[in-house]
Amino acid sequence: MTVPGTFRKAVEAKDLSAITGSLDPGIEFHSPVMVKPYHGRDSVAALLGVLLEVFEDFHYTDELVSAGRPDAPAQALIFNARVMGKAVQGLDLLRFGDNGLVTGLTVMVRPLPAAMTLARAVGRT
């Protein structure tokens, strides 16, 4: 199984240890609700652990793999979930390094009221 497949399976299984293992030590995470990115495996894994708790009924609905730049592989995982009862649609954009680990993760969510609820929910944990 490829690392992209490993990351997806780990998220779907809510396996934080496996998620952490798929992250590069120097990963950069861009949150949909914070201006500054998070840096480093430990910080990003901690935040992803919170998201595993906050998202309800999380499931990926589609997967897109970049074919444009072999030197910078990327994958987009599209998901649906709920946060405090509000429906959320989102996208995890992953970038991979030469070692096959996730070096960049950008999460985008919509609609705005759900993104605001997500920010409140993450802030409570």
Question: Which sequence ranges carry the predicted segments?
Answer:
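C-terminal and inter-domain tail/linker signature
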Residues: 1-125
